[in-house]
Amino acid sequence: MIWRDDAIASQPAGQHFRNSHLSSFSEYLRAQAPELLPALGKASADVIGNLPHGTTIVALTYRGGVLIAGDRRATQGNYIANRDIDKVQITDNYSATGIAGTAAIAVEFARLYAVELEHYEKLEGVQLTFNGKANRLSALVRGNLAAAMQGLVAVPLLVGYDLDDPNGETAGRIVSFDVAGGWHVESDGYQAVGSGSVFAKSSIKKLYRPGGDALTALAVAVEALYDAADDDSATGGPDLVRRVFPTAIRIDSGGAVRVPEADIERIAREVIAKRTEAAREEADLRESGGDS
């Protein structure tokens, strides 16, 4: 999103906010400078096909919190456009998003959503409830529907810690959205979006255990992204040569924090070592069977 000094300068400085009682920054922007919103206008099929796309995002709840993680690859048709894009973003003290789809739209969604939450808190003096945060992100997704119909699709996952839940151990929340802005709180404790989501969810389904700790959730997320990359060319797996690994954010009663890269690298190396050993044993078994 490019902010221009003259974009909302048709009135005296400061007059816009004094004249507006909108607690939604996106609605204020839509009224004052709609050209600054993501994905306005029309794009040709050729342009859309050549835009970088990012996948895959996974999210899991654990005892006392929630974790979201994403791979690092963005593709442009059959090319790898970027190997180290960060697809998960902290949006306020107790929420984070991961957005799969057209990379530029996804990045702008995350930035605009973070401003939306901050804008509300400054005007109202309180943070939105978690359901309120989901509704605000839903409105942004719905506002992108026209662009989505042209192929500029961005599908988010919202995760957060619900401060209104009296039971802190089950306060982790995952919300999925459709392209029309409909949202759903996931009751299974996990979800994935993006082109590799089918493979990632299949992996999580076998590995996920409700009530696990944050470290276990991180291990499941990394392995799920590894499985997604194994079958989906648009998803990037851990790259030991370039030292590029998934990124992750965890949220608990203490707030949202990025998982240190060293922790993710260690788990990724353990997953690769385990898979390498399993493949070696399978090859040895086939070889011994062939000799007999």
UniProtKB/Swiss-Prot annotation:
Protein name as it appears in the record: Proteasome subunit beta
Membership in a protein family: Belongs to the peptidase T1B family.
First-listed, main subcellular location of the protein, grouped into a coarse class: cytoplasm
Keyword Transmembrane helix: no
NCBIfam families tied to this protein: 20S_bact_beta (TIGR03690)
Reactions catalysed according to its record: Cleavage of peptide bonds with very broad specificity
EC supergroup of this enzyme: hydrolase
GO molecular function: threonine-type endopeptidase activity
Active site: residue positions: 55 (nucleophile)
Subcellular location: Cytoplasm
Gene3D superfamilies membership: Glutamine Phosphoribosylpyrophosphate, subunit 1, domain 1
The keyword Protease is assigned to this record: yes
A single GO BP: modification-dependent protein catabolic process
Quaternary context: The 20S proteasome core is composed of 14 alpha and 14 beta subunits that assemble into four stacked heptameric rings, resulting in a barrel-shaped structure. The two inner rings, each composed of seven catalytic beta subunits, are sandwiched by two outer rings, each composed of seven alpha subunits. The catalytic chamber with the active sites is on the inside of the barrel. Has a gated structure, the ends of the cylinder being occluded by the N-termini of the alpha-subunits. Is capped by the proteasome-associated ATPase, ARC.
Domain of life: Bacteria
EC number: 3.4.25.1
Pathway of action: Protein degradation; proteasomal Pup-dependent pathway
Activity control summary: The formation of the proteasomal ATPase ARC-20S proteasome complex, likely via the docking of the C-termini of ARC into the intersubunit pockets in the alpha-rings, may trigger opening of the gate for substrate entry. Interconversion between the open-gate and close-gate conformations leads to a dynamic regulation of the 20S proteasome proteolysis activity.
Function: Component of the proteasome core, a large protease complex with broad specificity involved in protein degradation.
Any single GO CC term annotated in Swiss-Prot or TrEMBL for this entry: cytoplasm
Propeptide residues, chain positions: 1-54
CDD domains (alphabetical): proteasome_protease_HslV
Keywords attached to this entry: Autocatalytic cleavage, Cytoplasm, Hydrolase, Protease, Proteasome, Threonine protease, Zymogen
